[in-house]
Amino acid sequence: MDRPYVSRNNHERARLRALVDRLSDRDLSRPLEAGWTIAAVLAHLAFWDQRILTLIERWEKDGLRSVPRSIDGKDVDWINDSAKALCLALAPREAARLAVNTADAVDRRVEALSEQHVAANAAAGNPISLFRSEHRREHIDEIEHALGPSRAR
C-alpha cells in the first residue's frame, strides 16, 4: 500500500524540530495574529496531533469497524478558540517541546497503522488525517514568515 504521508510527515516533522531548536525564548513569546504567540501555535499543533493520536489509540482498541467520525469543519474554529487560553498558559519552551514530542509520537503511530486501518479510514472519507504534514507546514510557514527572512531558516 502506498503511504505518501509518511515521507511528508517526516519532512515537516524535521522542519518542526529544526525550527524549535533555533527559536529563542524571546522568539517563542513573539505575538502573532489573533492573540496567539509562536509558542501557543506550537501548542496548538501538539493539541491537534494529540487528538489524532488519541483517536488512533481508541480505534485500535475498539476494533476496525469503529472508525472515528469526522470532525465538523465548522467546529474547528470554536475548538481552537477554546483551546487558545490553554495553549497560551503553557510555558513557551514546554509548548515547543510538546509540539516536537507529540509529532514524533503521532507520526510513529500513523506510520504503524495496519493496511486495514488505512483502507477503512480512506473508505470513511479520511476522518483521521494521516497527512499530519499539512497542518505542520501551514503553521511552520506562518512562524517563519513572522520571524522574517533573516531568522526563518
Where are these regions (language model features)?
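Alpha-helical bundle segments that constitute or directly flank the non-heme di-iron/ferroxidase center
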Residues: M1-D25, F47, R51-R58
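Short, contiguous alpha-helical
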Residues: S7, P31-W78, E115-R153
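Acidic/histidine-rich alpha-helical segments that form the ligand environment
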Residues: R8, K74-H117
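Amphipathic, well-ordered alpha-helical segments in soluble domains
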Residues: E12-L19, W48-R51, T102-A105, R109, ...
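A general structural signal marking secondary-structure boundaries and capping sites
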Residues: V20-L23, G63, A103, V110-H117, ...
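Short, charged helix-helix connector/hinge segments
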Residues: R26-R30
